[in-house]
């Protein structure tokens, strides 16, 4: 194979929908778990997840949809909702919007894909409209989001919702032109969507930024904001913002001690607590079919390659544990004619934005990403979620699979596990996540190992990228908090090396820092590890 530089990761191939993908076929379940074989010749049984969960009520039987027309919203907002194609409210919207319109503070808990973006945007827009905010009044609503992509998405919905209103709106986020943002703030932006770091920067340093008239603060994905290291920034932001006559809304998929602490300092005493999931028997969407596959390290890439080749006409998201691993696999797959897009925290903001919207608008395609895409993003018609590298926590699993089966639609997910990682299933069971075991017939897995090793040995650019990906995979693995399940010392490095295309695994240095390393490995907007890393040197070793 050629040793020329691999092409830039793009996805220009036009695709159409195909009903035949690599779907699980029915097998007789074992006593301890439900197993199905992944075979493209037979479709998945519609009730496969029910074998684990037992009988379930159909979506919508527990909650009767309420029309938006019952809210008595302003004509511009009503018209915008109609243009967006919405007629009735989701459960979180029906339970949240009325008290917010009445001026109450709300602490909301809802699974991803529940419609909470509209739940806080509609009251925010109505508040600005009722108070007749103008640019000279400065900022009346601030919405804080953990990631740039989610901020852009919220901004896009706000733009549609405010189309018939006179109020101004804008987005502040790291990676964007700070001076251009500051110029707009001085002119007056009534509704702001922002990431924490950039918002704090403007609050502290932008002269002429008027926020003394702030009437509403929205903190979205609060648990994620805190997880990626913005706890101190959030405390500073809340101290700087006026609290008198300010309505606050805090939304979090999980209720942790830190989220409770943040709610205490940001919300007024006695907020209304709304949890639409507490009576649900599963933590994930009703229409989501979930499975896992057990395979050794040296089989992982070949299994992924086989799956993606058979699902080129589907919309698929594949999650990895590190930026370098995403980069390597994207370069490799594009080089061998499996077109993919890639999204991770080391990319420049313009590249991330372009990739994000290209995948959203594509009828089919494959997106390789880190957890930068796991929270809150509403990507239409995703067929499969593949967790090639398992998450460190059931909450992360839930947010990853939340990219599919949204708003009552169906979807599928597949989790890759090593035999040594099966203990993670116990944690998922406690978190009310129903899973089937899937099995790939070995004869249908493409044996491309020799070709892969030949390519990596001859192509300098791919070899360097593979080495970086291999090192980062070990680095991420060593930072997992569930050490008894994800133990880097139990990895067979010879087999791990083969998955990255090495006949003999390279010698690499990895740094294992403080507990923050787990969250900084995605390098989205969180700061680098500020602990003193200890070195671990991994030589060529493998279990016999």
Swiss-Prot record:
The keyword Nucleotide-binding applies. Residues 1-10 have a biased composition (Low complexity). ATP binds at residues 110-117. It is an enzyme of class 3 (hydrolase). A motif (Bipartite nuclear localization signal) lies at residues 299-315. Residues 18-29 have a biased composition (Basic and acidic residues). SUPFAM superfamilies: P-loop containing nucleoside triphosphate hydrolases. Residues 287-456 form the Helicase C-terminal domain. Keywords: ATP-binding, Helicase, Hydrolase, Nucleotide-binding, Nucleus, Ribosome biogenesis, RNA-binding, rRNA processing. A motif (DEAD box) lies at residues 220-223. CDD domains: DEADc_DDX18, SF2_C_DEAD. Gene3D superfamilies: P-loop containing nucleotide triphosphate hydrolases. GO terms for cellular component: nucleolus. ATP-dependent RNA helicase involved in 40S ribosomal subunit biogenesis. Required for the processing and cleavage of 35S pre-rRNA at sites A0, A1, and A2, leading to mature 18S rRNA. Belongs to the DEAD box helicase family. DDX18/HAS1 subfamily. The Q motif is unique to and characteristic of the DEAD box family of RNA helicases and controls ATP binding and hydrolysis. This is ATP-dependent RNA helicase HAS1.
């Amino acid at each position: 194979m050629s040793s020329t530089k691999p092409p830039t990761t793009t996805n220009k191939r036009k695709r159409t929908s195909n009903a035949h993908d690599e779907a699980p076929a029915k097998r007789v379940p074992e006593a301890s778990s439900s197993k199905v074989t992944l075979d493209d010749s037979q479709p998945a049984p519609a009730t496969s997840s029910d074998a684990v969960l037992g009988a379930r009520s159909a979506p919508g039987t527990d909650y009767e949809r309420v029309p938006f027309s019952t809210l008595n919203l302003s004509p511009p907002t009503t018209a915008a909702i109609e243009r967006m194609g919405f007629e009735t409210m989701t459960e979180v919207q029906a339970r949240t919007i009325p008290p917010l319109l009445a001026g109450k503070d709300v602490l909301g808990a809802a699974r991803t894909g529940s419609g909470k973006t509209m739940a806080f945007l509609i009251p925010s827009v109505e508040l600005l409209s009722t108070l007749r905010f103008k640019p000279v009044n400065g900022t009346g609503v601030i919405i804080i989001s953990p990631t740039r992509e989610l901020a852009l998405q919220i901004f896009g919905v706000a733009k549609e919702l405010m189309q018939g209103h006179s109020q101004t709106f804008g987005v502040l986020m790291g990676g964007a032109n700070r001076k251009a943002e500051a110029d707009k703030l001085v002119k007056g932006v009534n509704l702001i969507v922002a990431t924490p770091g950039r918002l704090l920067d403007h609050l502290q340093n932008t002269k002429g930024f008027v926020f003394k008239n702030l009437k509403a603060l929205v903190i979205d994905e609060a648990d994620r904001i805190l997880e990626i290291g913005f706890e101190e920034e959030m405390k500073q932001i809340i101290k700087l913002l006026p609290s008198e006559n300010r309505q606050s809304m805090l939304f979090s998929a999980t209720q942790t001690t830190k989220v409770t602490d943040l709610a205490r300092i940001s919300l007024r005493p006695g907020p209304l607590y709304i949890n639409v999931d507490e009576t649900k028997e599963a933590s994930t969407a009703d229409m989501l079919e979930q499975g896992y596959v057990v395979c050794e390290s040296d089989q992982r890439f070949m299994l992924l390659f086989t799956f993606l080749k058979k699902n080129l006409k589907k919309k698929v998201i594949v999650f990895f544990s590190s930026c370098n691993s995403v980069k390597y696999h994207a370069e490799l797959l594009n080089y061998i004619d499996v077109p993919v897009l890639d999204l991770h925290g080391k990319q420049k903001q313009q590249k991330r934005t372009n990739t994000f919207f290209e995948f959203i608008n594509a009828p089919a395609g494959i997106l390789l990403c880190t957890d930068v895409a796991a929270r809150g993003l509403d990507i239409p018609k995703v067929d499969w979620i593949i967790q090639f590298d398992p998450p460190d926590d059931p909450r992360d699993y839930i947010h990853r699979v939340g990219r599919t089966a949204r708003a009552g639609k169906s979807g599928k997910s597949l989790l890759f596990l090593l035999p040594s990682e099966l203990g993670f299933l116990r944690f998922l069971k406690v978190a009310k996540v129903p899973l089937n075991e899937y099995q790939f017939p070995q004869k249908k897995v493409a044996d491309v190992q020799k070709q892969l090793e030949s390519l990596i040995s001859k192509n300098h650019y791919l070899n360097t990228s593979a080495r970086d990906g291999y090192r980062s995979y070990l680095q991420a693995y060593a930072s997992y908090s569930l050490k008894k399940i994800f133990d880097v010392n139990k990895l067979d490095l010879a087999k791990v090396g083969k998955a990255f295309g090495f006949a003999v695994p390279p010698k690499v240095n990895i740094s294992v820092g403080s507990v923050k390393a787990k969250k900084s490995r995605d390098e989205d907007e969180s700061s680098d590890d500020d602990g003193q890393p200890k070195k671990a040197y991994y030589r060529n070793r493998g279990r016999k």
